[in-house]
Amino acid sequence: MSLNDLNTLPGVTAQADPATAQFVFNHTMLRVKDIEKSLDFYTRVLGFKLVDKRDFVEAKFSLYFLALVDPATIPADDDARHQWMKSIPGVLELTHNHGTERDADFAYHHGNTDPRGFGHICVSVPDVVAACERFEALQVPFQKRLSDGRMNHLAFIKDPDGYWVEVIQPTPL
Protein backbone atom coordinates (compact mmCIF):
# COMPACT_ATOMS: atom_id res chain seq x y z
CA MET A 1 0.00 0.00 0.00
CA SER A 2 1.42 3.38 -0.95
CA LEU A 3 2.06 6.07 1.62
CA ASN A 4 -0.64 8.15 -0.04
CA ASP A 5 -3.12 5.27 0.35
CA LEU A 6 -2.08 4.77 3.98
CA ASN A 7 -2.79 8.44 4.65
CA THR A 8 -6.35 8.05 3.36
CA LEU A 9 -7.34 5.24 5.72
CA PRO A 10 -10.22 6.05 8.09
CA GLY A 11 -8.99 7.61 11.29
CA VAL A 12 -5.60 8.67 9.90
CA THR A 13 -4.68 12.32 10.14
CA ALA A 14 -2.40 12.75 7.13
CA GLN A 15 -1.29 16.26 8.03
CA ALA A 16 -0.05 16.09 11.61
CA ASP A 17 -0.48 19.11 13.82
CA PRO A 18 2.78 21.11 13.65
CA ALA A 19 2.74 21.15 17.45
CA THR A 20 3.70 17.43 17.33
CA ALA A 21 6.69 17.87 14.98
CA GLN A 22 9.26 17.35 17.73
CA PHE A 23 7.47 14.49 19.53
CA VAL A 24 9.55 11.30 19.95
CA PHE A 25 8.33 7.86 21.01
CA ASN A 26 10.56 7.59 24.07
CA HIS A 27 9.84 4.35 25.91
CA THR A 28 7.61 1.44 26.68
CA MET A 29 7.29 -0.30 30.04
CA LEU A 30 7.12 -3.97 30.95
CA ARG A 31 6.42 -5.30 34.43
CA VAL A 32 8.85 -8.09 35.33
CA LYS A 33 8.77 -10.72 38.05
CA ASP A 34 12.50 -11.34 38.57
CA ILE A 35 14.64 -8.31 37.77
CA GLU A 36 17.93 -10.25 37.78
CA LYS A 37 16.67 -12.67 35.13
CA SER A 38 15.21 -9.81 33.08
CA LEU A 39 18.35 -7.68 33.26
CA ASP A 40 20.43 -10.70 32.22
CA PHE A 41 18.16 -11.34 29.24
CA TYR A 42 18.00 -7.77 27.99
CA THR A 43 21.69 -6.94 28.58
CA ARG A 44 23.45 -10.25 27.80
CA VAL A 45 21.11 -11.73 25.20
CA LEU A 46 19.94 -8.57 23.40
CA GLY A 47 22.75 -6.12 24.16
CA PHE A 48 20.75 -3.40 25.89
CA LYS A 49 22.65 -1.08 28.22
CA LEU A 50 21.25 -0.21 31.63
CA VAL A 51 21.14 3.59 31.52
CA ASP A 52 19.22 4.45 34.67
CA LYS A 53 17.62 2.99 37.79
CA ARG A 54 15.16 4.58 40.17
CA ASP A 55 14.13 3.06 43.48
CA PHE A 56 10.84 3.81 45.21
CA VAL A 57 11.52 2.11 48.54
CA GLU A 58 8.32 3.11 50.32
CA ALA A 59 6.20 1.98 47.38
CA LYS A 60 8.30 -1.21 47.06
CA PHE A 61 9.17 -1.00 43.38
CA SER A 62 12.11 -0.06 41.17
CA LEU A 63 12.36 1.17 37.59
CA TYR A 64 15.19 0.11 35.28
CA PHE A 65 15.75 1.92 31.99
CA LEU A 66 17.59 0.18 29.15
CA ALA A 67 18.51 1.23 25.64
CA LEU A 68 20.30 -0.16 22.60
CA VAL A 69 22.94 2.55 22.42
CA ASP A 70 26.68 2.93 22.08
CA PRO A 71 27.99 3.09 25.68
CA ALA A 72 30.21 6.02 24.68
CA THR A 73 27.08 8.13 24.10
CA ILE A 74 25.72 7.65 27.63
CA PRO A 75 26.43 10.70 29.81
CA ALA A 76 28.24 9.81 33.04
CA ASP A 77 26.71 12.68 35.00
CA ASP A 78 23.38 11.64 36.56
CA ASP A 79 21.49 14.83 35.69
CA ALA A 80 22.81 14.88 32.12
CA ARG A 81 21.97 11.18 31.71
CA HIS A 82 18.39 11.75 32.96
CA GLN A 83 17.91 14.53 30.41
CA TRP A 84 19.57 12.51 27.63
CA MET A 85 17.39 9.49 28.37
CA LYS A 86 14.23 11.57 27.96
CA SER A 87 15.31 12.58 24.45
CA ILE A 88 16.26 9.26 22.84
CA PRO A 89 13.83 6.86 21.15
CA GLY A 90 13.37 3.21 22.03
CA VAL A 91 14.00 3.08 25.77
CA LEU A 92 12.77 -0.04 27.55
CA GLU A 93 11.55 0.51 31.10
CA LEU A 94 11.38 -2.56 33.33
CA THR A 95 9.24 -2.18 36.44
CA HIS A 96 10.01 -4.57 39.27
CA ASN A 97 7.63 -4.83 42.19
CA HIS A 98 9.80 -6.00 45.07
CA GLY A 99 9.16 -9.55 46.28
CA THR A 100 7.46 -10.90 43.16
CA GLU A 101 10.57 -12.96 42.39
CA ARG A 102 10.01 -14.99 45.56
CA ASP A 103 6.37 -15.87 44.80
CA ALA A 104 6.30 -19.11 42.80
CA ASP A 105 2.67 -18.55 41.77
CA PHE A 106 3.14 -14.97 40.62
CA ALA A 107 3.18 -14.16 36.89
CA TYR A 108 2.42 -11.21 34.66
CA HIS A 109 0.16 -11.67 31.66
CA HIS A 110 2.18 -11.11 28.47
CA GLY A 111 -0.90 -10.35 26.37
CA ASN A 112 -0.58 -13.06 23.73
CA THR A 113 -3.13 -15.44 25.23
CA ASP A 114 -6.68 -14.65 26.25
CA PRO A 115 -7.49 -12.05 27.24
CA ARG A 116 -5.28 -10.66 24.49
CA GLY A 117 -3.74 -7.25 24.89
CA PHE A 118 -0.11 -6.21 24.61
CA GLY A 119 1.64 -8.15 21.85
CA HIS A 120 5.40 -7.69 21.61
CA ILE A 121 8.39 -5.44 21.23
CA CYS A 122 10.75 -5.69 18.26
CA VAL A 123 14.52 -5.55 17.88
CA SER A 124 16.16 -5.00 14.50
CA VAL A 125 19.45 -6.88 13.99
CA PRO A 126 21.97 -6.74 11.11
CA ASP A 127 21.77 -10.53 10.48
CA VAL A 128 18.64 -12.30 11.71
CA VAL A 129 20.02 -15.77 10.87
CA ALA A 130 23.18 -15.20 12.93
CA ALA A 131 21.16 -13.66 15.76
CA CYS A 132 18.82 -16.66 15.89
CA GLU A 133 21.77 -19.08 15.85
CA ARG A 134 23.20 -17.18 18.82
CA PHE A 135 19.84 -17.27 20.64
CA GLU A 136 19.69 -21.05 20.07
CA ALA A 137 23.21 -21.43 21.51
CA LEU A 138 22.17 -19.35 24.53
CA GLN A 139 19.08 -21.57 24.94
CA VAL A 140 16.70 -18.64 24.61
CA PRO A 141 13.12 -19.89 24.23
CA PHE A 142 11.54 -19.23 20.84
CA GLN A 143 7.91 -18.48 20.15
CA LYS A 144 8.59 -18.66 16.40
CA ARG A 145 11.77 -19.71 14.65
CA LEU A 146 12.75 -18.46 11.20
CA SER A 147 11.78 -21.87 9.80
CA ASP A 148 8.28 -21.81 11.34
CA GLY A 149 5.43 -20.88 9.03
CA ARG A 150 5.51 -18.77 5.88
CA MET A 151 7.09 -15.66 7.40
CA ASN A 152 10.67 -16.96 7.33
CA HIS A 153 12.26 -13.52 7.60
CA LEU A 154 11.45 -12.95 11.27
CA ALA A 155 11.53 -14.76 14.58
CA PHE A 156 10.04 -14.30 18.03
CA ILE A 157 11.93 -15.09 21.21
CA LYS A 158 10.58 -14.92 24.76
CA ASP A 159 11.96 -13.05 27.73
CA PRO A 160 11.87 -14.52 31.27
CA ASP A 161 8.29 -13.28 31.79
CA GLY A 162 7.08 -14.71 28.48
CA TYR A 163 6.93 -11.36 26.68
CA TRP A 164 7.55 -11.83 22.97
CA VAL A 165 10.46 -10.07 21.28
CA GLU A 166 10.25 -9.96 17.50
CA VAL A 167 13.63 -10.15 15.76
CA ILE A 168 13.97 -8.72 12.25
CA GLN A 169 16.66 -7.38 9.96
CA PRO A 170 16.21 -4.20 7.91
CA THR A 171 17.48 -5.73 4.66
CA PRO A 172 15.95 -8.71 2.81
CA LEU A 173 17.29 -12.18 3.63
Swiss-Prot record:
Cofactor: Ni(2+); Zn(2+)
UniProt-annotated binding residues for substrate: 31, 97, 116, 120
Record field: catalytic activity: (R)-S-lactoylglutathione = methylglyoxal + glutathione
Transmembrane segments: none
InterPro entries: Glyas_Bleomycin-R_OHBP_Dase, Glyas_Fos-R_dOase_dom, Glyoxalase_1, Glyoxalase_1_CS, VOC
Top-tier EC class: lyase
Family: Belongs to the glyoxalase I family.
Protein name (record): Lactoylglutathione lyase
